[in-house]
């Protein structure tokens, strides 16, 4: 019994020792328990705990960048291109885009093949089935070539039709615009036009500023002293006479400078008539001289 009481007395003392062996045993025991727990945990949980830490996240980010860089080099292609300004740029293209692949060769048709294809297109724009097979056999072409030619020909016809419609629409619009401009100009000219004054020579037999005797003798034949007036149109007789022009338009100053032999009432051709009269009277005088 004494031993049992001593053991009971020793128990509390061991618990009270802060830095004794019991504390160190507890730490080792906790570490062993942690190891056991991690050993029993699944690999996914371990990866999740490591990724949750900042160091683990950095390590995982570095690995992903390396994988991306490796994938970029494997699946991408870098090309150096010089632009118009002389600057060199780097373009990253996928390797699936084969730039070195030769272009597809265009099918060249002979004149006879084109003629037959055009004739068939004018007859029917869609050739299918046996007709296409027979046409390809006759022209020594494949059915694919015949099919593609008809597709391209239909596309070309649609483009031509749309272009013609645009031209017609533009021409009709321009014609309508020109017609409207002409009509507008004619309307403006009709509204702005002023009625012309009647001709003075057609309305009056002579100039209104001159005397009445001079009006009638202004147009006289030098060989015939009888006055000859211009014929008056019938329409001018009924129309009213215009107001007389001012006297400054017909000044009588030149008439004052005429010699004294010229009278205002006489004709301007009176000297010529006097000469004719003298010629007519000259044979009688010569006869008188002969008698003397």
Swiss-Prot record:
Whether Thylakoid counts among this entry's keywords is no
State one Pfam family annotation: Homeodomain
GO BP annotation list? axonogenesis; camera-type eye development; dorsal/ventral axis specification; embryonic eye morphogenesis; forebrain development; negative regulation of transcription by RNA polymerase II; retina development in camera-type eye; Wnt signaling pathway
Q: Which UniProt keywords apply?
A: Developmental protein, DNA-binding, Homeobox, Nucleus, Transcription, Transcription regulation, Wnt signaling pathway
Query: Where does the protein end up?
Result: Nucleus
Tell me the PANTHER family matching this sequence.
Answer: HOMEOBOX PROTEIN EMX-RELATED, VENTRAL ANTERIOR HOMEOBOX 2
| Name of the protein in question | Ventral anterior homeobox 2
According to its UniProt entry, this protein's organism is Mus musculus (Mouse)
